[in-house]
């Protein structure tokens, strides 16, 4: 069941749902608006001949910090990693779904490629997979509204929530845009 604004506020006020920084004006009728952090991971296109998900490729991306009063310019066809300004703590009985903002989608901005699902138990900043599908560059400003997180009540709390240690949980506690750790899926 999708949480309403009333349910979202109750979960925040009870301490079940953690959001830092929290601004009550970000609570919408059935979601929480999320803002863009000033950290981005830009791909080093000349460093590797290809992307190999079996290999760590630690120099595949470079961390770039954009000051609050400046814009990061996302060029047509470009893909970068960003992150939410907010750090979340999702309880074991809730799951989340991150969606883009309609107004930005109408400009050609995609906020995620495939990773829009947020597991129960997740803590950290949500990494954004930002793509510009327009034919003009898009200016992205730290602090701007970039997406919205809808929260769903599960039929029962997860037995092994994300980060519990029984799962891989390789992105638990992430700060800022976190590069892929797909190579860990190939290890026994």
Swiss-Prot record:
Active site (UniProt): 129
Which reactions is this enzyme annotated as catalysing? dCTP + 2 H2O = dUMP + NH4(+) + diphosphate
Q: Summarize where dCTP binds, as residue positions.
A: 101-106, 119, 127-129, 148, 162, 174
Q: Which UniProt keywords apply?
A: Hydrolase, Nucleotide metabolism, Nucleotide-binding
| S-S bridge residues | none
EC number per UniProt: 3.5.4.30
Where are the residues marked Important for bifunctional activity as a site? Answer: 116-117
What Gene Ontology molecular-function terms does this entry list? dCTP deaminase (dUMP-forming) activity; dCTP deaminase activity; nucleotide binding
Q: Name one GO biological process term.
A: dUMP biosynthetic process
Which pathway?
Pyrimidine metabolism; dUMP biosynthesis; dUMP from dCTP: step 1/1
Nucleotide-binding keyword on record:
yes
Q: Please give the function described in this protein's UniProt entry.
A: Bifunctional enzyme that catalyzes both the deamination of dCTP to dUTP and the hydrolysis of dUTP to dUMP without releasing the toxic dUTP intermediate.
- Family statement: Belongs to the dCTP deaminase family.
Q: How does it assemble?
A: Homotrimer.
Name listed for the protein in its UniProt record: dCTP deaminase, dUMP-forming
| Organism expressing this protein natively | Corynebacterium jeikeium (strain K411)
């Amino acid at each position: 069941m999708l949480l309403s604004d009333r349910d979202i506020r109750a979960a925040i006020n009870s301490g079940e749902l953690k959001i830092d920084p929290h601004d009550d004006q970000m609570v919408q009728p059935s979601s929480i608006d999320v803002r863009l952090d000033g950290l981005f991971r830009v791909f080093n296109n000349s460093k590797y001949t290809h992307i190999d998900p079996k290999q760590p490729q630690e120099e595949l991306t470079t961390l770039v910090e954009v000051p609050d009063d400046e814009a990061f310019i996302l060029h047509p066809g470009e893909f970068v990693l960003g992150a939410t300004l907010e750090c979340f703590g999702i309880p074991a009985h809730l799951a989340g779904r991150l969606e883009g903002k309609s107004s930005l989608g109408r400009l050609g901005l995609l906020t995620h490629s495939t990773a829009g699902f947020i597991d129960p138990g997740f803590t950290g900043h949500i990494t954004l997979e930002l793509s510009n599908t327009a034919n003009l560059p898009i200016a992205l400003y730290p602090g701007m509204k970039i997406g919205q997180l809808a929260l769903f009540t599960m039929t029962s709390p997860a037995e092994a929530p994300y980060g519990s240690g029984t799962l891989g949980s390789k992105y638990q506690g992430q700060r800022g845009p976190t590069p892929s750790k797909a190579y860990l899926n190939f290890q026994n």
